[in-house]
């Protein structure tokens, strides 16, 4: 799925997880990539990849977003696509969660995406392009104990829709990819635990996804194969959002009825 040969792409949150897998996928498809993450150390793995340039910086800084686009254009040519993937998760419910944590999550997950979007659009506007935002099933449904994360992901999913409406006349497509439980640093604390096992039991496919499975969908969206796809929020979730969440389905399967 996807053909990104010679596409010039920026990817944020490229140091691990979905961002790292996306850079690898795009490099395999012979794209020219600027990979952005918070520290130089998190980008050292890029050294063996051809046509990939790294930039260390904080996506909440407007100058970093401008620099990543300028670096891509100066190094490789006109910008074709942006993958706005950087994000954080802080646990906490509405009663006990702190506003400090809330502000931090919103700053990275929403402000960082908005800044990246504006910078990418400024570079793409003459010729068009594609922007893929990493949302989450937590932007499509609610979770217990993740209030700030839920708000932030709901915001960027709707940002993708709004941007698709605003930018279509410029031939710029904007979509959100909404992963479910994926084996990344955000979920490593649940793996092999009672909570993790319960999460897997509620997934129709019966397992967590891999970052590469999300990267494949992102690579499709950055390619010309998705030329008529915009304003979409695409679940990559093992089927978790296909159901209502009612217990009967899962209990029936466990008892052998389904």
Kindly give the residue locations of the regions a language model identified.
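Conserved glycine-rich cofactor-binding loop
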Residues: 15-16
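Substrate-binding pocket helix/loop in short-chain dehydrogenase/reductase
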Residues: 93-94, 98-103, 199
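Active-site helix of classical SDR
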Residues: 117, 152, 160
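Alpha-helical segment proximal to the catalytic Tyr-Lys
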Residues: 122, 165-166, 227
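Residue(s) in the substrate-gating loop at a strand-loop-helix junction
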Residues: 136
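Short, small/polar-rich loop/turn modules that mediate ligand/substrate recognition or access, typified
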Residues: 168, 173, 229-231
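C-terminal helical subdomain
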Residues: 176, 194-229, 236-238
């Amino acid at each position: 799925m996807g053909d990104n040969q010679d596409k010039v792409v920026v990817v944020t949150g490229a140091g691990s997880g979905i961002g790292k897998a996306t850079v690898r996928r795009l490099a395999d498809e012979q794209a020219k990539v600027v990979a952005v993450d918070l520290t130089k150390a998190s980008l050292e793995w890029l050294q063996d990849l051809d046509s990939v340039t790294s930039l260390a910086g904080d996506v909440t800084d407007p100058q970093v977003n401008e620099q990543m686009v300028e670096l891509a254009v100066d190094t490789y040519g006109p910008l074709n696509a942006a993958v706005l993937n950087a994000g954080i998760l802080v646990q906490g419910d509405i009663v006990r969660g702190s506003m400090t944590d809330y502000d931090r999550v919103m700053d990275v997950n929403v402000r960082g995406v908005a800044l990246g979007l504006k910078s990418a659009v400024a570079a793409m506007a003459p010729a068009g392009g594609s922007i893929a935002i990493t949302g989450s099933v937590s932007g499509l449904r609610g979770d217990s104990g993740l209030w700030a994360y839920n708000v932030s992901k709901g915001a960027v999913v709707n940002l993708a829709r709004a941007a698709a409406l605003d930018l279509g006349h410029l031939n710029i497509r904007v979509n959100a990819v909404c992963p479910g439980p994926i084996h990344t640093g955000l979920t490593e604390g649940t793996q092999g635990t009672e909570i993790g096992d319960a999460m897997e039991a509620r997934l129709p496919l019966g397992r967590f996804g891999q970052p590469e499975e999300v990267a494949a969908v992102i690579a499709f969206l950055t390619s010309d194969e998705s030329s008529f796809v915009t304003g979409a929020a695409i679940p990559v979730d093992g089927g978790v959002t296909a159901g209502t969440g009612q217990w009967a389905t899962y209990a029936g399967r466990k008892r052998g009825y389904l």
